[in-house]
């Protein structure tokens, strides 16, 4: 892991006896494997893995061409997940996502043709370019882990993870996702442009005659299910729960925000804090675990107040949230 880019204490060797060391090693090896093809995004890799371990879905908001699809493909390979990708354009129908019935001439009956979400990892590319009906079809799959077609409900494979991308608001042909759908994503991340050094490394790798490094499978879907179970068992004290509640409460009373963090956001922050603790080799959560994830988990769930008729930028919204968090005293643990 590159010095200066990863969060401190991630993947330390000081494992708690209660945590299965094999699972932590699998996560570390998976992160290292993904870094073969995704250069300079160590924190993003860690947080995507954490979200998968917490049972959540990921929203990557960024301009085209910064490696979102490369990240998703590498992630699916390292975790041995069945992977489907769909480009969400204006003509994509809900049935393309969920599936539909088609006539079988041999039997005279209708057979179900599964949609693109019948996989372990579904990359919903440019989700904010499609219709609200198609977005709603994906919403059910994300929320229920199942889809309903003609009154018949079908379970999706376990694990099921949505990694959606969207272009920044204001891009041509895009529309803002409704708050109800944004709230279903456990975390929103931005990969951002690479540094000059990182882009130089990417250019050299792409120009080389050598074959691109292969991302090898490190863990299985069953390993991920075990990791999720282990993460759920991480201990959270009453003081930490109170800290998360006070953080979210502070967002609801701040005049700079029209809408604060929902209870769903608080639950997501608690789940992600458990995974942060597990990644650091602890079987209990400390305040630093909460602060490590809170902004990424909650920034897309708040609505800022207008300033002189204009909405603050995303970076300004994140700074408002960070400022609110700094004003909440963490417990001494």
Language-model features: locations:
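Canonical AAA+ ATPase core
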Residues: 104-109, 130, 134, 142-219, ...
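Conserved beta-strand position immediately N-terminal to the Walker
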Residues: 58, 122, 160
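Pre-Walker A (pre-P-loop) alpha-helix and adjacent loop at the N terminus of AAA/AAA+ ATPase modules
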Residues: 22-63
